Curated annotation (Swiss-Prot):
Coiled coil: none
CDD domains assigned: HPS_like
Originating species: Arabidopsis thaliana (Mouse-ear cress)
Protein name listed in UniProt: Putative lipid-binding protein At4g00165
Matches recorded under PANTHER family: PTHR31731
Family to which this protein belongs: Belongs to the plant LTP family. PEARLI1 subfamily.
Gene3D superfamilies: Plant lipid-transfer and hydrophobic proteins (1.10.110.10)
One GO CC term on file: extracellular region
Amino acid sequence: MGISKALRSLLILLLLNITFFFGHVTPGATVKPCPPPPAKQATTKCPRDTLKFGVCGSWLGLVSEVIGTPPSQECCSLIKGLADFEAAVCLCTALKTSILGVAPVKIPVALTLLLNSCGKNVPQGFVC
């Protein structure tokens, strides 16, 4: 019983395809993993509206008169939920644009007072 020419041609073609496929696949080939996404850069912009930080200015005027008086809830609620760095950036921006009416020389002190009074810390190495 003989195999027909068409079937024989089909089998030869199939064998050639299998040979070609396995002949070109290297046994040690590995898939290169995707590189990890870049680390999230610390933003240098305030995620909140800087003009709203004007409510913190009235408290800064009272610091010299009544030491220990906490800033208004409005002021602290603006930085609530922000990381220390983000809160520092927001207050620094507000201080630099004179929204809070602080002399440039007193900006680092005012920034520290506001952040600490609202339960935040000035990040290490942060310069306003």
